[in-house]
């Protein structure tokens, strides 16, 4: 890996990604809260953006680790997803995602869901490739 600690930190900060979404009825379950599968899809989406901004490589999701549903996300609320690269290796990296929920007409957020997503950089043949030049 040919990257300095300073460059790594600069890339991590520059790749931090925020996405805000409204929770509409078509994204909810029979409890009138955000469907877990939709939450995970949104989390994968924001994490691949952060990972790509960090590496500027073609990446594939290889795992999602320990998704914790801490608070319900009711229909009609706003969520903010925040993704940041937390570690990287030769061909892989991990992104932590926090999903915060807030009422549509109230101030304040609380953490609703957290999880970590792992990615591998791949070449045009879908074989692992170094994230940074060696």
Model-derived features: positions:
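HotDog/MaoC-like acyl-thioester-processing domains
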Residues: 3, 9-19, 74-75, 86-134
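Hot-dog-fold acyl-thioester-processing enzymes
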Residues: 2-63, 120-134
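Conserved interaction-surface patches within small, structured recognition/assembly domains
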Residues: 62-72, 80-84
């Amino acid at each position: 890996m040919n990257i300095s600690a300073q460059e790594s930190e600069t890339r991590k900060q520059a790749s931090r990604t925020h996405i805000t979404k409204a929770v509409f009825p078509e994204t909810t379950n029979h409890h009138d809260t955000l469907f877990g599968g939709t939450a995970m899809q949104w989390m994968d989406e924001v994490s691949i953006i952060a990972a790509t901004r960090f590496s500027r490589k073609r990446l594939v999701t290889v795992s999602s680790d320990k998704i914790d549903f801490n608070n319900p996300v009711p229909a009609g609320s706003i969520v903010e997803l925040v993704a940041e690269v937390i570690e990287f290796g030769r061909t892989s990296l991990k992104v932590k995602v926090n999903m915060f929920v807030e009422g549509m007409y109230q101030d304040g957020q609380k953490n609703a869901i957290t999880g970590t997503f792992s990615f591998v950089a791949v070449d045009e043949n879908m074989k692992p490739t170094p994230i940074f030049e060696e």
